[in-house]
Amino acid sequence: MRICIDAGHYGKYNRSPAVPEYYESDMNWKLHLLLKKELEKYGFEVVTTRADKNKDLGLNARGKASKGCDLFLSLHSNAVGSSVNEDVDYVAVYHLYEDDGTDIDERSKALAQKLAPVISRVMGVKQAPKVCSRRGSGDWNGDGVLNDNYYSVLNGARLVGTPGLIIEHSFHTQTRATKWLMDDQNLEKLAKAEAEVIAEFYGMKQTKTPELGLPMLRQGDTGGTVRALQALLRGYGYSLTVDGIFGPKTANAVECFQEDNDLDADAIVGPLTWAALMGLE
């Protein structure tokens, strides 16, 4: 299972009028890294839309970065205008607009319905959470109908066939919510809760393997860690060359090893595969 996380905005963006030290972009960046770490504990492969907090990527391109993934998440906090508003304090999760009743529509909506109340409870917001979609007036998918998703990141995800969500973690125009989001311990709670909901939704269980400090490997990777992987596979009797290049033969050996050990045979070496290779299951 592969998830793409987007930290909404970049640099120093969307300063809070309620707590001037808060920038939405800072919170999004911290939270997306924490969520990545928590999801990986369940065996998810997690990619992000960019590696540098200070570099931007177009909205549609961010959604399209989820190509080949099972889920796209864009993390945010919301705002009511540009001034303080203490009355509006709720969590909103936007799912794909249901314009054609596809499976990705249904999955994004179903997960949104699971996430919204949990995030709301963890954050202790004033008002009930909202699960919604928003229709725009564009024709991104080229079907001739001007009814696609209003949000470009979700359009990008839809165009590559990925269920997508925008998660608005209440409002940075509200003082209490903003201060809550500035606490790193609270962000850790959020990441754990969101990862738990997502893992349950996809039927993933938290791995009980130790932290090995080993990178996830896949076809195309090279280097000493790939060479070590190949040596381990050779030791188990799989036929491949120990050359430090993760090519088709190495991928085939990994997939065969995974099948023989009742693991997901995806030819990606993550925590569970490393643990099995090293006899730590």
Language model feature labels by segment:
Residues 107-147:
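Active-site-adjacent substrate-binding region
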Residues 4, 12-15, 22, 74-81, ...:
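Active-site-adjacent mobile loop/cap segments within catalytic or ligand-binding domains
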Residues 5, 230, 254-257:
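Conserved hydrophobic/aromatic packing and binding residues within compact polymer-binding modules
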Residues 201-243:
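Acidic, Ser/Thr/Pro/Gly-enriched interdomain connector segments
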